[in-house]
Amino acid sequence: MATATDRAPHQVQVHTPTTQRVDVPRRGYDVSGGGIKTLLPERGPSTSQIIAVLVGVPTGGTLLLLSGLSLLGTIIGLAIATPVFTFFSPVIVPAVVTIGLAVTGILTAGACGLTGLMSLSWMINFIRQVHGTTVPDQLDSVKRRMADMADYVGQKTKDAGQQIQTKAQDVKRSSS
């Protein structure tokens, strides 16, 4: 078993950081005259940050303007349409309900039909995968099985006929 005295000595090198400077922001009043500068980064923004601001501010401002115009148009339209809706509500509400129910019924019927077609398609594909054959192959297989069955029945009929003939001859011999 190896002990600490059996091993060769290792050398360890220790490097002290001479180029890194750690700034710890101080709280309160700075008497050295640094003031607020100690809280700011030592270098300015990168080029990509400047481009992002130059592109983002006009784009964001334009989108904010468009959303404000959209909100203003909605409020004006609602202010104009509210008296019309109030006046025609006995006609509009039943018409909207009827149209809504009709559209819902048509969409439901279409969804049920589509679901049925998808289910039928899935079943056909599943059956094809289980059997591994197509319809013409299945028909050929059925024809072969029918021919084999006809040969089998014919052979059995011949065998039965021969057995009957043999028994008849045995009976004839035994009676004579």
UniProtKB/Swiss-Prot annotation:
Region (Disordered): 157-176
Top-level division of the source organism's lineage: Eukaryota
PANTHER family: OLEOSIN, OLEOSIN 18.2 KDA
Transmembrane segments: 50-80, 95-117
Tissue specificity annotation: Expressed in seeds (at protein level). Not expressed in leaves.
Subunit: Homodimer. Forms oligomers.
Keyword NAD: no
Localization in the cell: Lipid droplet; Membrane
Residues modified as N-acetylalanine: A2
Family designation: Belongs to the oleosin family.
GO annotation, biological process: lipid storage; response to freezing; seed oilbody biogenesis
InterPro entries in UniProt: Oleosin
Protein name: Oleosin Ara h 14.0101
Function: May have a structural role to stabilize the lipid body during desiccation of the seed by preventing coalescence of the oil. Probably interacts with both lipid and phospholipid moieties of lipid bodies. May also provide recognition signals for specific lipase anchorage in lipolysis during seedling growth.
One term under GO cellular component: membrane
Classification via Pfam families: Oleosin
Keyword set, alphabetical order: Acetylation, Allergen, Lipid droplet, Membrane, Transmembrane, Transmembrane helix
Membrane topology: Multi-pass membrane protein
